[in-house]
């Protein structure tokens, strides 16, 4: 594996947020519990992803887990209380749902770099990422029905779009675990590489993506998400279109005419069939 010098962009307690040549990397840093997340972990990830979204130097975002044994094993069951996962404020919550939506709407590609276990809510995080590079030691699966939990959102509905309804029901009803090759065969990941090469491969994919039009990638992500995200997905795509429209001379003519208190001259712009 190439020895890269990742730059720390911000210090957190339960995650790492680093940068390397246009790539932001968010790492769940709780290896002692297989990178299970708490409300604080999720809040920190939301903050880091929001910063990556706004950072003009960031083109692609990588989500991973600390160490080689786990990407993420889902919510920390020791923090689960009455009504949700209890944080330092003693309020039960499921803020991981906010994180899932954020990953979906960020107008930049998000790649899951999976080493070891991606189970439970960890597999759902894998599911909502745009692409997945899996190490050959990766293990995938859902655990909810075993521990009195479930994900009736992206973790089931969108999972079924990816692997098919029959396979998704198998994953949830049986709570089995699947190795990296099995995950590749069902379309849950994009590629499988040796553990020692997983970061090299992920960075290579990032660099290939970064050669392409960020506006085109933004619209492609929004278009593919709109199919499964309903009106929220359409809203995101419409917002992306509006931002692009604002950069055109046609939009600027309307704005300038209003500011200059005159009628806009829209006849000068083409009306393509």
Curated annotation (Swiss-Prot):
The record marks 85, 246 as: Important for catalysis. One of its GO terms (biological process) is menaquinone biosynthetic process. The keyword Lyase applies. Its cofactor is hydrogencarbonate. GO terms for cellular component: cytosol. This is 1,4-dihydroxy-2-naphthoyl-CoA synthase. Homodimer. Can also form trimers and higher oligomers. InterPro entries: ClpP/crotonase-like_dom_sf (IPR029045), DHNA-CoA_synthase_MenB (IPR010198), Enoyl-CoA_hydra/iso (IPR001753), Enoyl-CoA_hydra_C (IPR014748). It comes from the Bacteria. The keyword Lyase applies. PANTHER family: 1,4-DIHYDROXY-2-NAPHTHOYL-COA SYNTHASE, PEROXISOMAL, NUCLEOSIDE-DIPHOSPHATE-SUGAR EPIMERASE. Belongs to the enoyl-CoA hydratase/isomerase family. MenB subfamily. It catalyses: 2-succinylbenzoyl-CoA + H(+) = 1,4-dihydroxy-2-naphthoyl-CoA + H2O. Its EC number is 4.1.3.36. Keywords: Lyase, Menaquinone biosynthesis. Hydrogencarbonate binds at residues 142-144.
